[in-house]
Design a protein with these regions (language model features):
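C-terminal beta-strand-loop-alpha-helix "lid" module of Rossmann-like NAD(P)-dependent dehydrogenases
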Residues: 1-210
């Protein structure tokens, strides 16, 4: 479906207002992981003893509710199919009616309880989605969680992107970014503990991505 210029401006304004908060949380996680390499946390559990063929990957696939947006939906669904074809075990969490109907026609199961439209996105809905996948990760029902979506580079340019949400990894790219900003070394003190901090802010970071 066509997106009106008013809706587009509203969406961009909302993104601009929330991005600084989200980036601050994401940077805090990166700083903790960077400065405390020995920290262990439930969200950093890569489950090294689990064989690749036994790992369960969860994919949050974000599509539209209608099919008039051309490549917007096609490219996301194509990327999702490429990923699940390489997996023995996976779960699909589909946002958007078009995506659900597509996988249904392909006889590919999706999480039935995960029934969300793409219309009127909100932080409340993002939190519910986040809680669902985070709980399954903590319970060992998922070993990795990704989100596949359309990244809007500009009002006329988009591309498909896939982000690894869980487990949290030690991303060296963030270290390079901090060095670019002139942050080479710093002392940080975390209260009550690094583990408690990560338990509190990692779900918010994941919700921010969603």
């Amino acid at each position: 479906y066509m997106i009106s210029s008013t809706k587009l401006r509203k969406a961009k304004k909302s993104l601009e207002e929330t991005e600084p908060y989200f980036n601050a949380l994401r940077n805090m996680v990166s700083r903790v992981v960077r400065h405390l390499p020995d920290v262990e946390n439930q969200y950093m559990d890569v489950r090294p003893n689990k064989a690749p063929e036994d790992r369960i990957k969860g994919f949050i696939v974000v599509t539209a509710d209608k099919g008039l947006a051309g490549a917007y939906n096609h490219n996301v669904l194509k990327k999702a199919m490429e990923e699940i074809e390489q997996c023995k075990n996976y779960k699909l969490f589909v946002v958007g009616e078009l995506g659900r109907q597509y996988f249904k026609k392909q006889n590919i199961p999706v999480a039935e309880q995960f029934h969300y439209t793409a219309q009127n996105p909100s932080l409340h809905r993002a939190r519910i989605i986040c809680e669902e996948v985070v709980e399954q990760f903590k319970e060992g029902e998922l070993d990795e969680v990704y989100v596949i979506y359309t990244y809007m580079k500009s009002s006329i340019s988009t591309e498909v992107d896939m982000i690894n949400l869980l487990p949290i990894t030690r991303d060296m790219a963030m270290q390079h970014e901090m060095e670019r900003q002139g942050v080479f070394n710093e002392e940080i003190e975390l209260q009550p503990s690094p583990n408690a901090l990560l338990n509190n802010i990692v779900p918010d970071v994941i919700m921010g991505y969603i």
